[in-house]
A protein has these predicted regions:
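N-terminal capping segment at the start of a domain
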Residues: 26-60, 231, 314, 404-408, ...
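Metal-dependent peptidase/peptidase-like ectodomains
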Residues: 108-110, 123, 146, 150, ...
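Soluble metallo-hydrolase cores and metallopeptidase-like ectodomains found primarily
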Residues: 26-28, 113, 117-143, 238-322, ...
Length: 523
């Protein structure tokens, strides 16, 4: 009984100790709120990132210009150790300077369409008939042999358009947040579905066949988007990566679904359709290397330890990369500025070094952040699989905070299956309940750079954000522009994140970690 009582007292004492060190500092939060909500610069930062230096395709000259601007801005604010860290090789970059597409027969109409990134130039203004290639296997391809040259190839059928009886933008409601909060901790990820490899293999053969037949261009209509919104990403090569200078690539474009459907219906009626198209594009980045932007706010007594915040700086090429991810980049830069102003106002210095990272190559597979983790925290195989940890640095990072889900305000944090941080983050969220930040979920979320850190046994977190019109209108689309950023939401996000980062830097201990099977290796 005495042993049980002593154990209970120990648990209670430990809990009180945890609560004490994680109680939010009201002096810090007051200053953070003032500089984040009342003296915000986030929309001006976003305008520079998007209006002046958008879009920022990895490997493009515009990304290089944006990188120079970001470094200068961070230095002017007073951040330390501002520098670039190389990763790669990535391969060739790309930019386009002119694009047009028209239907010229049976009647004229201008077409809304955009080239896919890494498409080569056409040979001036080219004109030809549209052909629909319908093939389910290699035998079907034989009937198209010798028939694609000088043609525009359609690969998609008609996509039905459903009218927007509900608003394309939305906010999370109480039920949404409750469901997230009640979600169980993630289990083991399912094994890869190897049954799908057959279809994937045929798609590779299909594209290799098309490239060999040398049509004028391949055109699709995307799987979503309407009302002139076109979602566009990168071209495909006959094999391998389009960034490989030796890859064979033909012009490719995505057309608005309304125009694509109209042309398809004309062809169904036996009416030939002729298009004209011109694309002027240039391959760039001859050395093949890319860079992440790194900047720091020095720590004090625990300066050898680090807390990181970051966002990907690169974008796709048809909009200006505003919600993806100029918003996240602007917020993380603004959060860093807020922390600097808070330090000046309060005289309270962070104990750990705060390190900002603006990643590149995220849109091609988290390449910049994975390269950084490889250089600092983990040993990887040639294929990129993490094999062991570089303990000297990996043991000194407390955590990484990421933002990459659009313009929406922060509603909480995805804990990425890490129960140890729940009481800590609950305490840190509490002062921002009035701003709508209330929810913690054990759920994982993917598709962005915190995964690179999580994979290396480092606490890595993405914030829960309001969806707004991210998936329906702006993500990877031609409408991803500054005008779709919500100022009050971005102010709130920068404020909440600045508080989380600074409180992480002030803790006596690093953030709790999940169990990992990864072992220490060579540094």
């Amino acid at each position: 009984m005495k042993k049980l009582s002593l154990l209970l007292l120990l648990v209670i004492a430990t809990s009180f100790s945890l609560l004490a060190q994680d109680a939010p500092n009201p002096t810090l939060n007051t200053a953070i709120r003032k500089h984040g909500m009342e003296k915000s610069q986030v929309m001006d930062i976003a305008s520079w990132v998007c209006d002046v230096y958008g879009p920022r395709l990895t490997g493009s000259p515009m990304l290089d210009k944006a990188t120079d601007w970001a470094q200068k801005t961070l230095k002017d604010w007073g951040m330390s150790n501002v520098h670039l860290e190389a990763w790669g090789p990535f391969g060739r970059g790309w930019e386009f300077s002119h694009f047009e597409m028209h239907a010229t027969a049976p009647s004229y109409f201008p077409i809304i369409a955009y080239p896919k990134a890494w498409s080569p130039s056409t040979k001036g203004l080219v004109s030809g008939e549209v052909i629909y290639l319908q093939a389910d296997d290699e035998a079907d391809l034989e009937k198209y042999k010798g028939k694609l040259k000088g043609k525009f190839v359609f690969l998609d059928t008609i996509r039905t358009i459903n009218e927007w009886f509900d608003a394309p933008a939305k906010r999370l409601v109480a039920e949404d947040l409750l469901n997230m909060a009640n979600a169980p901790a993630p289990g083991r990820r399912p094994d890869r579905d190897f049954n799908r490899l057959g279809g994937f293999s045929f798609n590779q053969k299909l594209f290799k066949f098309i490239v060999a037949e040398d049509p004028l261009a391949v055109i699709d209509r995307g799987f979503k988007g309407d009302l002139g919104t076109v979602f566009v990403s990168g071209a495909r090569a006959d094999e391998g990566r389009v960034q490989d200078p030796k890859a064979k690539v033909i012009p490719q474009a995505t057309m608005s679904v309304e125009h694509y459907n109209r042309i398809f219906r004309l062809m169904q009626k036996g009416i030939p359709v002729t298009l004209s198209m011109e694309l002027k594009a240039t391959y760039t980045n001859p050395d093949g290397m890319e860079h992440n932007i790194i900047a720091e706010i020095p720590g004090s007594d625990l300066k050898d330890e680090v807390v990181m915040l970051g966002a990907h700086f690169d974008s796709w090429h048809t909009g200006t990369g505003a919600t993806d991810n100029g918003a996240g980049s602007a917020v993380m830069m603004e959060a860093s500025r807020i922390i600097l102003e808070t330090i000046k106002e309060t005289g309270i210095k962070p104990r750990r070094t705060i390190r900002l990272a603006l990643w590149t190559g995220e849109e091609q597979g988290l390449l910049g952040s994975r390269g950084y983790v490889k250089d600092h925290y983990a040993n990887t195989s040639p294929e990129g699989t993490i094999q062991s940890l570089k303990e000297a640095e990996q043991s000194k990072i407390s955590g990484y905070f990421n933002l990459d889900n659009g313009t929406g305000k922060v509603r909480g944090v995805y804990l990425q299956g890490n129960p140890g941080v729940m009481p800590i983050f609950r305490a840190w969220l509490d002062p921002f309940k009035d701003l709508g930040a209330t929810t913690l979920t054990m759920q994982n979320t993917g598709g962005t750079d915190h995964q690179s850190f999580d994979a290396a046994g480092i606490p890595g977190f993405q914030f829960i954000q309001e969806p707004v019109a991210y998936s329906t209108r702006t993500h990877h689309s031609n409408m991803d522009n500054w005008d779709h950023l919500v100022a009050d939401d971005l102010k709130q996000a920068a404020t909440v994140i600045a508080s989380f980062v600074l409180h992480t830097a002030m803790r006596d201990e690093k953030l709790p970690r999940k169990a990992t099977e990864l072992k220490a290796g060579s540094n």
